[in-house]
C-alpha cells in the first residue's frame, strides 16, 4: 500500500416531522393508498373533543361533495384507550386543515403492508452466505423486506449510480472533494454494492445516496469528511429519514477530535454509522473515525473465521465482518474483488439497513442489535478485541 495523506480508503485492492403542521412522511417510493391518510389525535384529547372534531371533518366532506369535489372522507375511526384517530381519503386542502387543528398529534400517509417471505440466494458471495449462517454455508438467507424503505449514505469516493446492481435505487447526493461526479477509484461503488447491490448486496432494496469525499487517489481532507457527514445528516433530516438511514465510511486517518465529534452527531441525530477499523494491523484507538466510541467500528475476517492479517484490532472494534476477497460491483459494469476493512464495514451497514426495515428499529439502535445477534466465532481476534462475527439473525 502507499502511504497515507490526510485520508485513505481502507482497501487493499485497487418517519419524522417534515413541517410545523405535523404531517409525517414515509420513505420515497413506498407504496401508499392514493390520497389516503391516517390521523392520530393527541393523547389528552377528550371523547367530547374527538366527537366534535369528527363532526367538523364530516361537515368539510359534505361541503366538498355538494360542490362536486372529489374526496371520500373518513373510512375508519379508531377510539382505543390511548389512541383516538381515523383514516380515510382526503385532498390536500383538507389534510392541511386537519393538521392545523391543535388537537391533532400527527397525520401520515396510509402505506401498504405486505406479507414477508424468506428468500434464499444460491451460490452467493461468501461474505453474504457467512453472515446469514451461524456455522457457515453456501447460501444467503434473508427476509424479503431486504432493506426496503431504508437509505444508505455512502461517504466515499463516489458511486456509479447507473450500475445495474442498483436497479435505479442509487442517486448522486453531494460532491465535497472535486468537480467529477464519478467514482475514480472503484472503491465507493464496491462498498455500495456490498450494502445494497442486487447480487452482491445485503439490503437489496435499500436506496443508495452517494456522498463523495475522496478523490481519484482515494484521499481527501478531514474537513471534507466532516462536511460529508454534515450534508448527510441535513439531507436525511430534510426527507424525514434520520431514523431509517445508515451511513458508511470505509476510510480513516490519524485521530481527529473534530471528525469523531462530527461522526457522533450523526448517531445522536438518529442514524446508524459504520466505519472501517483500518488496515495496519495495529490498535485502532489511534485512528479516526474508528476510535469514536458511539460508532460501529468493523474489523475484517477471512473465509475461515480468522482475523484478516491486515486488520486493525483493539477495544474500539465492535464486530468482525467479512473483509477478505470480497466480490462486488465495479464502475462501468461488472464486478471486482477487493480486500480490506473497507469491505467489512459495508457488510455491517447492509445488515443494519436490513434490520431497520425488518424489525423497525431506529438507526441509532442498530449497532446494539448487531452485537446482540453476533456470534463469538473469530479465532485470534487480537488483544482486547471482540471475537464476535456479524450475523443477520436468519435463524440458520
Swiss-Prot record:
Compositionally biased intervals (Polar residues): 376-389
CDD domains: Peptidases_S8_PCSK9_ProteinaseK_like
Chain residues in the propeptide: 21-116
Sequence segments annotated as region (Disordered): 376-396
Active site per UniProt: 156 (charge relay system), 187 (charge relay system), 342 (charge relay system)
Superkingdom field: Eukaryota
Annotated signal sequence range: 1-20
Subcellular location: Secreted
Domain Peptidase S8 intervals: 125-396
Sequence ranges assigned to domain Inhibitor I9 in this UniProt record: 37-113
InterPro entries: PCSK9_ProteinaseK-like, Peptidase_S8/S53_dom, Peptidase_S8/S53_dom_sf, Peptidase_S8_Asp-AS, Peptidase_S8_His-AS, Peptidase_S8_Ser-AS, Peptidase_S8_subtilisin-like, Peptidase_S8_subtilisin-rel
Glycosylation positions in this chain: 63, 230, 248, 392
PROSITE patterns recorded: SUBTILASE, SUBTILASE_ASP, SUBTILASE_HIS, SUBTILASE_SER
UniProt keywords, alphabetically: Glycoprotein, Hydrolase, Protease, Secreted, Serine protease, Signal, Virulence, Zymogen
MF (Gene Ontology): serine-type endopeptidase activity
Single biological process term from Gene Ontology: proteolysis
Function field: Secreted subtilisin-like serine protease with keratinolytic activity that contributes to pathogenicity.
Record protein name field: Subtilisin-like protease 5
Species this chain originates from: Trichophyton equinum
UniProt gene name: SUB5
Amino acid at each position: 500500500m502507499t502511504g497515507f495523506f490526510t485520508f485513505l480508503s481502507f482497501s487493499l485492492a485497487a418517519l419524522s416531522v417534515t413541517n410545523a403542521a405535523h404531517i409525517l412522511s414515509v420513505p420515497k417510493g413506498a407504496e401508499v393508498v392514493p390520497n389516503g391518510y391516517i390521523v392520530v389525535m393527541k393523547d389528552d384529547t377528550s371523547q367530547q373533543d374527538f366527537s366534535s372534531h369528527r363532526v367538523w371533518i364530516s361537515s368539510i366532506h359534505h361541503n366538498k361533495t355538494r360542490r362536486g369535489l372529489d374526496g371520500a372522507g373518513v373510512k375508519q375511526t379508531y377510539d382505543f384507550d390511548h389512541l383516538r384517530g381515523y383514516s380515510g381519503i382526503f385532498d390536500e386542502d383538507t389534510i392541511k386543515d386537519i393538521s392545523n387543528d391543535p388537537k391533532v398529534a400527527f397525520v401520515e400517509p396510509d402505506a401498504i403492508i405486505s406479507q414477508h417471505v424468506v428468500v434464499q440466494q444460491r451460490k452467493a458471495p461468501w461474505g453474504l452466505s457467512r453472515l446469514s449462517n451461524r456455522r457457515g454455508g453456501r447460501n444467503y438467507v434473508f427476509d424479503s423486506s431486504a432493506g426496503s424503505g431504508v437509505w444508505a449514505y455512502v461517504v466515499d469516493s463516489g458511486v456509479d449510480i447507473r450500475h445495474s446492481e442498483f436497479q435505479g435505487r442509487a442517486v448522486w447526493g453531494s460532491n465535497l472533494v472535486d468537480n467529477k461526479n464519478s467514482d475514480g477509484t472503484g472503491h465507493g461503488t464496491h462498498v455500495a454494492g456490498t450494502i445494497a447491490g442486487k447480487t452482491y448486496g445485503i439490503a437489496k432494496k435499500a436506496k443508495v445516496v452517494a456522498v463523495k469525499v475522496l478523490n481519484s487517489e482515494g484521499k481527501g481532507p478531514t474537513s471534507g469528511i466532516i462536511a460529508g457527514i454534515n450534508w448527510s445528516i441535513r439531507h436525511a433530516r430534510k426527507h424525514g429519514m434520520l431514523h431509517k438511514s445508515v451511513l458508511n465510511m470505509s476510510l480513516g486517518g490519524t485521530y481527529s477530535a473534530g471528525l469523531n465529534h462530527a461522526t457522533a452527531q450523526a448517531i445522536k441525530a438518529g442514524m446508524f454509522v459504520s466505519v472501517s477499523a483500518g488496515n495496519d494491523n495495529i490498535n485502532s484507538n489511534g485512528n479516526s473515525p474508528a476510535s469514536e466510541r458511539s460508532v460501529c467500528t468493523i474489523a475484517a475476517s477471512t473465509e475461515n473465521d480468522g482475523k484478516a492479517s491486515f486488520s486493525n484490532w483493539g477495544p474500539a472494534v465492535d464486530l468482525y465482518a467479512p473483509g477478505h476477497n470480497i466480490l462486488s460491483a465495479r464502475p462501468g459494469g461488472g464486478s471486482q474483488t477487493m480486500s480490506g476493512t473497507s469491505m467489512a464495514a459495508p457488510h455491517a451497514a447492509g445488515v443494519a439497513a436490513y434490520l431497520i426495515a425488518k424489525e423497525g428499529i431506529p438507526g441509532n439502535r442498530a449497532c446494539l442489535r448487531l452485537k446482540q445477534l453476533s456470534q463469538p466465532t473469530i479465532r485470534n481476534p487480537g488483544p482486547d478485541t471482540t471475537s464476535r462475527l456479524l450475523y443477520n439473525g436468519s435463524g440458520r
